[in-house]
Amino acid sequence: MNTFLPQKWMRLLFVLPVLNFTFGCTQKFNDVSATVQEAYGNYIDVELTPEEIESVPYASAYLKIGSQKQVFVVLAFAESNPLTGQTQLKWVSADKAMVVTENGHIVKTIGLQTTNLAGVYGDVPAYSHSSAQYVLSYDWSEQYRYGFQAHVERSHQGKEILTTPISSTETEVYTEVVTFPSLEESVENTYWVDSDGQVVKTRQHLGPTMVPVELTILKGYSKS
């Protein structure tokens, strides 16, 4: 069980807002990760109590890669994507990994112990019970693989109650089949969406033959 040090989070109140983070600024990235790590002891396979989660003054989530143990991540930055107009959420772990999402869709990763996603581009329609088809473009940083077109078919699967240590939420479950014609491969992703249309849990493959990445929101992001 993780040994949590709530008072350490007070340092985050001063560190995170002034960092003006960019991906190219390694020192600032390290500062965020180090501060998060100092806030609690064992950040791998962590299971926080409801009180510990509520003590964190930022949005937070559990991140799990394949069969690896889950880690705790916090929302360090929320920035508008000028290409889509969507808010990009940048989740940071204590071991210097980052996952970037746009309403639950993982669009970039840094420092994961798997093939990292350099970018996903394209317009994703809002969630509805009607089926949807759209096209995305995938870039992977490993071996500089860029511009792989993907055809996506999304369908509604029904309702499911999603339970975390601090909430129980009725969700609509959607699956999407992502097909890469040039690779003759496909993957299936799953999204749990609340009544406000926000993704509160996702299980996604970053590409063909890659292990799934699972992100479960504990405390959600709010613009207010």
Segments and roles (model prediction):
Residues 17-18:
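Hydrophobic membrane-insertion alpha-helices, especially the h-region
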Residues 26-101, 105-111, 133-224:
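Acidic, serine/threonine-rich low-complexity disordered tracts
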